[in-house]
Each structure stands twice: as structure tokens, then as C-alpha cells.
Amino acid sequence: MTRSVKKGPFIDAHLLKKVEAAVQTKDKKPIKTWSRRSTILPDFIGLTIAVHNGRQHVPVYVTENMVGHKLGEFALTRTFKGHAADKKAKR
């Protein structure tokens, strides 16, 4: 279910402050955040945001195609190592 247009996109206030400061100073240093639930706005384009995945901060370079998505979509939380191999196929 999508969010109501009337409400607008959700973004944490502390992240918005950091982004606005980085845009004003034209700072290219990654912005560290734990807010995976925040929506990517057009102001974020060209910035690198380090999104926490539960273990470490994953750098995410924001492009135009990412606008409207959530930050957490681009920092995967699970690592897939593959299914167990079939013992008969190894012989």
C-alpha cells in the first residue's frame, strides 16, 4: 500500500538537516544514517549516503532513478550464499 499523496513523502528531520547542510556547502563526504525508512528526494541526487544495514554502513550514491524509493532498498540486510549443492550431481 502506498503513502497518501496528501501526507507527502516521509523523511527523518535529522537526515534532512544533514542533506541541506551538505548541499549548501557542496560537501561530497558520505552522510551516515540509520534511517532506512526515509524516502529519497530530488535534493539527494549526487550525494553519497551511508545507510546502515544492521552491521555496517553501505555507501549509496543517489541517482535520478532512485527518487521516490526508500533508502533501505539499496542497502541489503541479508547475504545469500546459495542453496546447498546436490550430492548426486557432484559425482
Swiss-Prot record:
Q: What keyword terms does UniProt attach to this protein?
A: Ribonucleoprotein, Ribosomal protein, RNA-binding, rRNA-binding
**InterPro entries linked to this entry:** Ribosomal_uS19, Ribosomal_uS19_bac-type, Ribosomal_uS19_CS, Ribosomal_uS19_SF
Molecular-function GO term, any one: structural constituent of ribosome
Q: Does the keyword Iron apply?
A: no
Example GO biological process term?
Answer: translation
Q: Which Gene3D superfamilies does the annotation name? A: 30s Ribosomal Protein S19, Chain A
Q: Does the keyword Lyase apply?
A: no
Q: Record's PROSITE patterns?
A: RIBOSOMAL_S19
List, alphabetically, the GO terms of the cellular component aspect: cytoplasm; small ribosomal subunit
Give the protein family: Belongs to the universal ribosomal protein uS19 family.
Q: What is this protein called?
A: Small ribosomal subunit protein uS19
Native organism taxonomy: Bacteria, Pseudomonadati, Pseudomonadota, Betaproteobacteria, Burkholderiales
